């Protein structure tokens, strides 16, 4: 599945370069962008509240509720992240009609609490978002708090930990690629899809060419999240969906 990304700051659709808030590109009204994605065949939207991600007190809940309603009216599924800190945050979003809630830094800083969420909520409604930095020794270290803090926790360690409580969806981003149009880390996705075949992996970061969609699908990922390439009209969602459908999946 191809999932277009919609990142929001102060009610505006934006993209960050490598997660830096000071490196923003603005693309205007999120409703008109959402409408374009609907027209081009979207079946799911990836929405991130970047204000909420930076400070949970600034979550754009009214906007999220309206965008979710618009998505549902258009028969779109929606997954949302940004500033999720409590079980009540998840309940609120699911009540809005959100299909999946994305859990980022909180899953690393408070694993005991988040593992309880996996037993309380349907694991299919939760997405574990792991941003990783790959060092010179090819260690895949998890980065948290909007990519501001590198941990010594390995990607594989986190997946294995949450796999024990029914983990279904993992969104994995190589932060050196995100928002750069520099291409995807195909080897990363090949290895994790091979190791955990029952988990649905979402690839994110750097997709700049339609040919990468072919490579990513053959790597075994369940879906690809694409943001900047659509917003800057490198190719259309319609073209990306067609490319995905024509690709031969590793199954």
UniProtKB/Swiss-Prot annotation:
Pfam families: His_biosynth
EC number, UniProt record: 5.3.1.16
GO molecular function, one term: 1-(5-phosphoribosyl)-5-[(5-phosphoribosylamino)methylideneamino]imidazole-4-carboxamide isomerase activity
CDD domains cross-referenced by the UniProt entry: HisA (cd04732)
The reaction(s) this protein catalyses: 1-(5-phospho-beta-D-ribosyl)-5-[(5-phospho-beta-D-ribosylamino)methylideneamino]imidazole-4-carboxamide = 5-[(5-phospho-1-deoxy-D-ribulos-1-ylimino)methylamino]-1-(5-phospho-beta-D-ribosyl)imidazole-4-carboxamide
Record flagged with keyword Amino-acid biosynthesis: yes
Gene3D superfamilies in alphabetical order: Aldolase class I (3.20.20.70)
Originating gene: hisA
Keywords, alphabetical: Amino-acid biosynthesis, Cytoplasm, Histidine biosynthesis, Isomerase
HAMAP family listed in its UniProt record: HisA (MF_01014)
Record's protein name: 1-(5-phosphoribosyl)-5-[(5-phosphoribosylamino)methylideneamino] imidazole-4-carboxamide isomerase
């Amino acid at each position: 599945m191809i999932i277009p990304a919609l990142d929001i700051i102060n009610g505006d659709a934006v993209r960050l370069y490598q997660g830096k808030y000071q490196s923003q590109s603005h693309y205007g009204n999120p409703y008109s962008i959402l409408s374009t994605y609907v027209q081009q065949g979207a079946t799911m939207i990836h929405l991130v509240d970047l204000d909420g991600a930076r400070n949970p007190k600034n979550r754009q809940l009214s906007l999220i509720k309206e965008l979710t309603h618009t998505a549902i009216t258009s028969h779109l599924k929606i997954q949302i992240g940004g500033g999720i800190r409590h079980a009540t945050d998840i309940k609120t979003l699911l009540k809005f009609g959100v299909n999946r809630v994305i859990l980022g830094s909180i899953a690393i800083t408070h694993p005991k609490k988040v593992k309880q969420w996996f037993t309380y909520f349907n694991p299919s409604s939760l997405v574990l978002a792991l941003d990783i930095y790959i060092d010179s020794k090819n260690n895949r270290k998890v980065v948290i708090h909007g990519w501001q803090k590198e941990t010594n926790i390995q990607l594989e360690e986190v997946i294995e930990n949450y796999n024990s409580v029914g983990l279904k969806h993992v969104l994995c981003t190589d932060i050196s690629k995100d928002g750069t149009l520099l291409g995807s880390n195909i080897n990363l996705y090949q290895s994790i899809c091979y190791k955990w075949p029952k988990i649905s992996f979402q690839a994110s970061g750097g997709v700049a060419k339609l040919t990468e969609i072919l490579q990513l699908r053959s790597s075994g990922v369940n879906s690809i999240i694409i943001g900047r390439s659509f917003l800057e009209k490198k190719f259309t969602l319609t073209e990306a969906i067609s490319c995905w459908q024509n690709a031969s999946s590793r199954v």
